[in-house]
Swiss-Prot record:
Source organism (scientific name): Caenorhabditis elegans
NCBIfam families given in the database record: chap_CCT_zeta (TIGR02347)
Intracellular or extracellular location(s): Cytoplasm
GO molecular function, one term: unfolded protein binding
Family the UniProt entry places it in: Belongs to the TCP-1 chaperonin family.
Keyword Chaperone on entry: yes
Protein name (database record): T-complex protein 1 subunit zeta
Lineage: Eukaryota, Metazoa, Ecdysozoa, Nematoda, Chromadorea
Amino acid sequence: MSSIQCLNPKAELARHAAALELNISGARGLQDVMRSNLGPKGTLKMLVSGAGDIKLTKDGNVLLHEMAIQHPTASMIAKASTAQDDVTGDGTTSTVLLIGELLKQAESLVLEGLHPRIVTEGFEWANTKTLELLEKFKKEAPVERDLLVEVCRTALRTKLHQKLADHITECVVDAVLAIRRDGEEPDLHMVEKMEMHHDSDMDTTLVRGLVLDHGARHPDMPRHVKDAYILTCNVSLEYEKTEVNSGLFYKTAKEREALLAAEREFITRRVHKIIELKKKVIDNSPDGKNKGFVVINQKGIDPPSLDLLASEGILALRRAKRRNMERLQLAVGGEAVNSVDDLTPEDLGWAGLVYEHSLGEEKYTFIEECRAPKSVTLLIKGPNKHTITQIKDAIHDGLRAVFNTIVDKAVLPGAAAFEIAAYVMLKKDVENLKGRAKLGAEAFAQALLVIPKTLAVNGGYDAQETLVKLIEEKTAAGPDIAVGLDLETGGAVEPQGIWDNVTVKKNSISSATVLACNLLLVDEVMRAGMTNLKQPQPE
């Protein structure tokens, strides 16, 4: 009897070979699920929730988040792979495949009697050599629009069909370039993703400004304003109760009317200060007739205040979302104010066009033609919910791919070129490695081929035949020329315009190696939680 079973007779235990088999079966099971999703030729998965909601996706991160995984090892791999997506924005499926293949290659060695510690030493040596090659293999290049388009297109074509991916690529790259400031990393939170159930997915577009998901709340307000001054504020323009419990008493009806009038006057004075600012910048200017005035307030505006603003031709929006207030300020300029006591023309932003768009019962307000917007909106359109969700997930990955390229200032040849180069290099260098760790290093090199092998199978080609072609071409080409897989012909090609992120590849290989080594060194799996200690209650 094991020590844990002495302490807890109800504990479940798997030791040595059984523990290793448990870990490897979990990793390979998850690998088999994810394998067919890899690359631009990958297939889709249909996820059906308990409520009947349907989601079509080939994004590994979405799959791992949505699937209910019970196996402890598979669950651990899923969490590690989704963490990879959280940090770098991509590489989830590749990480799962690499972990599964590392454990698969190690299984045969361990079953032949090689200690798992020796295997992990070989893995760690090969991982170090691979990351050294990555630093030499990457292409440092000036961050220009053409390069960013190629990187983003490579990422999006693995998530969407080719025509849609090429269309959205332009929008994503222009969005990041619009918010980018010299010498600083772009803040991707300044790219708003607005959904609109309308038209086709090819109508997804970039708005160089902001789109708000609500409209004016007064029928007499203008719905189309050109050359608009915009006041961004967080001021209550409605009667609010006091924060503490308080009461006001009156003796007669006249006193009650006076009380109500005083409350109304307090709000009206605030509205008049906004109207005075409007008159100052528009009515008193020579070309004021051709200009408009817009108020966007984070707090509420009551009907009497809306009446006053509408009578002056002011378009007012109330209860704007907090997350949009900073974006609005960066898009139109000016300063967001918390009080109307000291309003000046310098507080105002400007937009060339503000208009309301109605779609069924929903209303949207577009703020466009901003002078130098530092915040933009990607307007995601689609005929149904699952199409919009699929595009939104892909845009997230595209934004991160562009961001990583700007930060890294380098890219990596794609189409599995790095994995082929690393395999050829490791097979050559492993000859200089002494001892049994050489077997682990060879297994690591073999595991790297899971990426080109899977890409070939998903493209409809024979895996072994394709691998032989690629390895022969790479060996003949030499270390300085990248050789990748051409999914149109199934042959070898030097990748042109197909780039991977350096950060994504580095994190994927590192995290896969660490997790595979940890799982190989597990010699006991114990299920001994408190739930197992509870005794059944007698009836």
